[in-house]
Amino acid sequence: MKITKIDNKGIELITSFEGFRSKPYLCPANVPTIGYGTTRYPTGIKVSLKDTAITKEQALIFLKNDISFYEKAVDSLCNDNLTQNQFNALVSFTYNLGANALKTSSLLKKVNTNRNDPTIKNNFLLWVFGGDGTRNSKDDDGDGLIDEIGEKLKLEGLIRRRTAEANLYFT
């Protein structure tokens, strides 16, 4: 039977990296966010910094509503039957980065060519760059230039998340 829904392992992976915030805040992309990364309520209304605090139970309801979009994206983009853990890992990846990131990634190409290819782990780990232009005196993007304009930083949180997703994918 084809897997089309994330299970509790997948939910736990996402919540462990997203973290819970009861009050609205601006995420690194400068978007008002609440709960476990929710930017729109199930009604479709955007989160506002003026909104009231929510409980963990409400946040989980919002997260599950949000995840349904990413489950559909992973299901439609992957042309092979995935295991539950493979599906969970790809939904977590897509929830964090967006459906377009998965759609255009070498990760998806590898998954669709051979879902058990061990080099897929390396493709998860390509997606560990982000940041706001903070300088760290390193060549984070490997092009031989240190702290040039537009250089993205390797973020420890993204390294941990992509590693956890890759590990789940292969269990």
Regions found by a protein language model. Give the residues of each.
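Amphipathic alpha-helical interaction surfaces
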Residues: A73-S76, N96, N100
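Long, amphipathic alpha-helical surface segments
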Residues: M1-V31, Y36-V47, I54-E71, N81, ...
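Short alpha-helical scaffolding segments that buttress acidic/His motifs in well-ordered protein cores
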Residues: I14, Q86-T94, N123-L125
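Short, structured surface segments that line ligand/substrate-binding pockets
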Residues: S76-F87
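Short, residue-level hotspots on alpha-helical faces of the histone-fold
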Residues: N65, S92-F93, L97
